[in-house]
């Protein structure tokens, strides 16, 4: 076949491979594999390898590309060698050139190839040694990322080298010469190691396939061999064009028969719409809470479950709702929440997220539940396990609060004052760092919301906390800030004392039925108040009342 026709075929091959990879994502790995088999990937393996390691593509989905290369291992093993070697060389070049994002994408690709046994682990260990030679923050971050993605695989196949890498990172952490960001990354990696890297490696749903492990290494002593292959993906004339077509036809038939046969054998997965696992997990958490004598015991049992991020959110929700269902608030739940927040930094985040979710649905809770939850959150704030960023979702105004939310906030602040004292609470709220977090709770614009907030805190007995808000009011409003409505009108609050009813001078009416001695005595007693018909006529005409003559009683 002449060169011009081969070049046209090459261009069509390149465009097809590029379009398939552009549409690639985690849900289309198997479909992309079938679409690539529509063209001669034996001839285009160089194009496929060069497109896989392209910077803009690797940065976005390095691990997904590694899974796609893994599927071709049983049919075109040369592709795994080309991609592994090119990714190693490009990482070395990009790291020296300071292209950090590209380095992280290549690391994700290499870790996926190593986890699936396409590439031998010696390549990753060489990269780890190179990163440790320059213990800068950038190198430490990449090394922690690599161990987070492939640490479980390295621990299984080369435990000694894996432990040595962790020991080096631990020594660097203890030296104290790293930035806080790098120190936090190392600490997070050590926590992952204690959990045996649970849930860290990316797993894809792939059909059964064979794998051939390639021992690809960097020849560091020969600088000329450390440059990426510039001819990868370039056009070349295939002198055995038709033989290559026959080989690909046989390969494609074998691959599709195996691939489609497995899809037919696989039954349609049953999706559990009853959430039975979630219900069972919640039941287990509830039984732990009810079967524990102290909050410390409950926290110990819950932490032994080693929950992930989503399970932590479930546990936090059950703890708060179980506290709300109690007859009265008990410190059991407060101590439990303290122990959970002190064990890992993700727990306070889960509690904060739950507070924001519950605050919008407070109208669904009963008054007793509002009291228990308010005291719970007040206890957590007083214990300083949750910050004042809890109040970022609170806007204290007449139109943005409900009676339920006002009652809820009242119990929070009353619990805070009971635990810390009014002086300490005021000190925390007036701190400069806390002002942006509580500006919705203590508005200082000098408008109706400010007046409403002042009246609210004054009504619940915490008017001391409103001193900073009163300074933002106009002069006339300052004098009436305790008795002003949100519309600016002066409010007259009734006294807490109920005034006594004025006693009437007229005698009480006594109803006596029938003729009896009692009726005679009553008429005789009240006869002095009836001056007679003549006097009544004079009173109507003169509009004056002449009191009856008093009788002298000796």
From Swiss-Prot:
<feature type="compositionally biased region" description="Basic and acidic residues">
    <location>
        <begin position="512"/>
        <end position="528"/>
    </location>
</feature>
<keyword id="KW-0507">mRNA processing</keyword>
<dbReference type="GO" id="GO:0005737">
    <property type="term" value="C:cytoplasm"/>
</dbReference>
<feature type="domain" description="MIF4G">
    <location>
        <begin position="14"/>
        <end position="196"/>
    </location>
</feature>
<dbReference type="Pfam" id="PF02847">
    <property type="entry name" value="MA3"/>
</dbReference>
<keyword id="KW-0963">Cytoplasm</keyword>
<dbReference type="GO" id="GO:0005684">
    <property type="term" value="C:U2-type spliceosomal complex"/>
</dbReference>
<feature type="domain" description="MI">
    <location>
        <begin position="280"/>
        <end position="396"/>
    </location>
</feature>
<dbReference type="InterPro" id="IPR016024">
    <property type="entry name" value="ARM-type_fold"/>
</dbReference>
<dbReference type="GO" id="GO:0003723">
    <property type="term" value="F:RNA binding"/>
</dbReference>
<feature type="compositionally biased region" description="Basic residues">
    <location>
        <begin position="498"/>
        <end position="511"/>
    </location>
</feature>
<keyword id="KW-0508">mRNA splicing</keyword>
<comment type="function">
    <text>May be involved in pre-mRNA splicing.</text>
</comment>
<keyword id="KW-0539">Nucleus</keyword>
<keyword id="KW-0747">Spliceosome</keyword>
<feature type="region of interest" description="Disordered">
    <location>
        <begin position="473"/>
        <end position="554"/>
    </location>
</feature>
<comment type="subunit">
    <text>Associated with the spliceosome.</text>
</comment>
<dbReference type="GO" id="GO:0071013">
    <property type="term" value="C:catalytic step 2 spliceosome"/>
</dbReference>
<dbReference type="GO" id="GO:0000398">
    <property type="term" value="P:mRNA splicing, via spliceosome"/>
</dbReference>
<dbReference type="InterPro" id="IPR050781">
    <property type="entry name" value="CWC22_splicing_factor"/>
</dbReference>
<comment type="similarity">
    <text>Belongs to the CWC22 family.</text>
</comment>
<dbReference type="GO" id="GO:0000974">
    <property type="term" value="C:Prp19 complex"/>
</dbReference>
<dbReference type="InterPro" id="IPR003891">
    <property type="entry name" value="Initiation_fac_eIF4g_MI"/>
</dbReference>
<feature type="compositionally biased region" description="Polar residues">
    <location>
        <begin position="473"/>
        <end position="493"/>
    </location>
</feature>
<protein>
    <recommendedName>
        <fullName>Pre-mRNA-splicing factor CWC22</fullName>
    </recommendedName>
</protein>
